[in-house]
Amino acid sequence: MILLGVTQSDTTEQAIWLAKKCCELRIFSDEQDKMNLSLFDVDGEAMIVSNFTLYADCKKGRRPAYVRAARPEQADGLYLRFVEEIRSLGIKNVQTGEFGADMQVSITNDG
């Protein structure tokens, strides 16, 4: 599961870099239970969901502000570019959420 937040200063180049980084991060366990394998190594799949709340600012008051999150037009384009790049890198099964939709997503963290 990749929860992708986009901020106002993000660029296409950064989206491409991040997609590659996500695929290359060694976050999966090997035979010795050491985090030593990447998404490529485990022939993994990806579920990518856009999430502007990752840029919530909770410093003032009791209601989060989302002023650092990119406008929907910019965020949607970078989200789609990120997804396209993950696919082009050879990840076979890439699922996506619907940009801007109110979705219920369940995650089970391991570790």
Segments from the language model and where they lie:
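Short Lys/Arg-rich amphipathic alpha-helical segments
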Residues: 1-48, 54-60, 66-80, 85
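Short, loop-centered acidic/histidine patches that primarily coordinate divalent metals
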Residues: 51-52, 108
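Positively charged, low-complexity, intrinsically disordered RNA-binding extensions
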Residues: 66-111
